[in-house]
Amino acid sequence: MTFFLRLFAGLLFVLPLAAPAAVQPVASVEGITEYRLPNGLQVLLAPDDSKPTTTVNLTYRVGSRHENYGETGMAHLLEHLLFKGTPRHPTVWAEFNKRGLRANGSTWLDRTNYFASFSANEANLAWYLDWLADSMTKSFIARRDLDSEMTVVRNEMEMGENDPGRMLFEKTLSAMYLWHNYGKSTIGARTDVEGVDIGRLQAFYRLHYQPDNATLIVSGKFDATRTLALIVQQFGKIPRPKRALPRLYTLEPTQDGERAVTLRRIGGTPQLMAAYHGVPGAHPDQAAAELLTLVMGDTPA
């Protein structure tokens, strides 16, 4: 009987790590395999045993362009607040340090992402995936944390305001996009950020931080089968949301002539920036356009 109980306990531990037959590959290109969980989460696995590390990146398809009037800076604020933890993971940064994870997050126009790199280790991988899954729907997003984090956000604002290159970039975008949110700073307007309503911020979180609005990428050294099973185990229990994401329909009118911006600052080195409306990221010409910007704008060797 003792042997049977031990064997049964072992089976309980091992069986969840066998990838469910229901989760089948959607596509596979150049060593990257895509899966789609029933709740809508997109998963990309790119194993490479030649690497000593594992990198995990969870990207939400929400950025500053999804913010409405009075909400500027919300996507960036949420990025900060997610690191304040969940009931099951209340001390996120302490865990990062203890486990040797190099982790952070970033916010941009179209997305917010959370990422970590660490020496290949299944225990750390399992822990980080568990935190990412828990943070998707159970982050505190509390008023007390917002108040304490406001100092950090203000410092970021002031650093940007004191960076001539960044300010010129923001002024250029605002001239390129008069109606679309691409013309607004990702960090937001100071009045919106300092006066943010916590209930409105929580609603923004519940709307966008859902499995059907996210892509999870694991790359580097890891066991693909066991990792997929971990992902299904930790993310699969999150239900597919019933809400529909609002349709963004604002289009920038065709530009009808050259626009110019002059930014005057005391001292410093004069800077010039030229910007053009180009092709979107998924366009076949995007790679060539990116290469052209490097050829024309990069510092000569």
Stretch-by-stretch model annotation:
Residues 6-18:
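Bacterial N-terminal signal peptides
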Residues 23-60:
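Mature N-terminal segment immediately following signal peptide/propeptide cleavage
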Residues 40, 58, 76, 114, ...:
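Buried hydrophobic packing residues in well-ordered domains
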Residues 55-119, 162, 183-187, 299-301:
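M16/MPP (pitrilysin/insulinase) zinc-metallopeptidase core fold and M16-derived inactive scaffolds
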Residues 81, 86, 128, 135, ...:
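Scaffold signal of the M16-like zinc-metallopeptidase fold and its non-catalytic homologs
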Residues 85, 117-150, 298-300:
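M16/insulysin-pitrilysin zinc metalloprotease superfamily fold
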Residues 94-97, 140-158, 223, 242-256:
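Acidic/histidine-enriched alpha-helical segments
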Residues 178, 182, 186, 215-280:
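An aromatic/glycine/proline-enriched structural segment found at the starts
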